[in-house]
Design a protein with these regions (language model features):
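Bacterial N-terminal signal peptides that target proteins for export
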Residues: 1-9
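Short intrinsically disordered, low-complexity segments
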Residues: 12-13, 43
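Hydrophobic h-region of N-terminal signal peptides that target proteins for export
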Residues: 13-20
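Eukaryotic scaffold repeat domains enriched in small/polar residues
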Residues: 20-355
Length: 355
């Protein structure tokens, strides 16, 4: 009896010691310095995140004790993230082809959800590519392999699919970029292999297409991501190494970029976004940077370089800018999202304090 009690005491002490064992400090890289811009503007690095473990509340003592005995629970982490968008609730929604699903990070309510192929056995997601949201925070996901657009409600519940690979109306070869015009009730989709932009109604019927293969104005060579901004539809024309801007009816307005090996040109344009001052952000996947242009096509500044430290990227892809000018960049091969903050004129004083 005494021997059994001693053994039990030793086991308990080992468990308690493990529960309170000081953890080795995680290696933290120093944040890059703020980028001081013209007119008192400023770009700051905020943080990065990569898994559900960074959203949910920290586990208490008894939960950690159970983890030691039963093993730590599995947490969803990014595998090969590609596209990102934020909704009106401040949630960050990330497509992850490597995980065959979509991550929803809700930092305000400390919640996380993963949308996967198992959510709809009959018509599963295969390779989720790009994500968009509408005014009601419904989530739209293009699937480049299935040739469809998957629609979920704001809670993440599957609603329906749009399009197919089988021909007929809504026939896609490789749907990639997507944007939703909530006011006009329109959905815009790039079909990368057909070099076209589809304009759909909210039920998925095709209203219009525009574009063809070529290098001229309004022509495409491997179009990928797109964004709506005001009256503009902005399209990444990847293999023409540029970004083209149209009105919402598909009429060409202007283009930015061109192939080259110097700043202001593009080699692998990926994600795009527009800040509150109307400047255009373009991710270059090969160079591992984000370039920022004005509407005249002039390069204003850039940030990032190739690497694994904070503020560095390994094959970055998607980009999204929220209403507070926080910039979310998909750092794909580093398996994380990096967050920056642009402080425009009037949002930051020359003394360095908030106004």
């Amino acid at each position: 009896m005494c021997k059994s009690l001693k053994i039990a005491t030793v086991v308990l002490m080992v468990i308690l010691a493990a529960a309170f064992k000081p953890t080795k400090p995680a290696t933290r890289t120093e944040a890059p310095p703020d980028l001081q811009l013209e007119g008192g503007r400023r770009l700051s690095y905020e943080r990065s995140f990569s898994s559900e473990n960074e959203v949910k509340p920290k586990r208490g003592f008894w939960s950690r004790l159970v983890d030691i005995v039963a093993g730590e629970p599995d947490f969803h982490s990014m595998v090969r993230p590609y596209s990102v968008v934020t909704d009106s609730r401040g949630r960050v929604i990330v497509s992850d082809p490597g995980a065959a699903g979509v991550h929803i990070f809700d930092f305000a309510d400390k919640k996380y959800k993963f949308l996967s192929r198992a959510d709809n056995i009959k018509d599963p997601m295969l390779t989720p590519q790009c994500v968009a949201v509408d005014a009601s925070d419904n989530i739209y996901v293009t699937d480049s392999e299935a040739g469809k657009i998957f629609v979920f409600d704001a809670s993440g519940k599957y609603q329906r699919v749009i399009g197919s690979l089988k021909g007929g109306e809504g026939y896609f070869k490789r749907p990639t970029g997507i944007a939703v015009d909530a006011k006009a009730q329109r959905i815009y989709v790039t079909d990368t292999l057909r070099d076209k932009i589809f304009m759909l109604d909210m039920q998925g019927s095709v209203l219009q297409t525009f574009g063809k293969n070529g290098q001229g104005e309004g022509e495409f060579n491997y179009p990928t991501e797109l964004r709506l901004d005001g009256d503009n539809l902005i399209v990444v024309d990847a293999m023409n190494f540029r970004v083209q801007v149209f009105d919402r009816s598909g009429q060409f307005r202007f283009a930015i970029g061109g192939i080259g090996d110097s700043t202001g040109t593009m080699f692998r344009p990926k994600g795009i976004g527009v800040d509150s001052e109307g400047d255009l952000y373009v991710v270059d996947g090969l160079w591992g940077m984000v370039q920022v242009f004005n509407r005249q096509g002039d390069l204003l500044y850039y940030f990032g370089s190739r690497g694994t430290e904070a503020g560095e990227f390994q094959l970055p892809t998607g980009l999204s800018i929220d209403a507070q000018d926080r910039i979310f960049v998909v750092d794909s091969f580093n398996r994380r999202i990096q967050v920056f903050h642009f402080y425009g004129a009037g949002k930051w004083s020359h003394a360095g304090g908030s106004q």
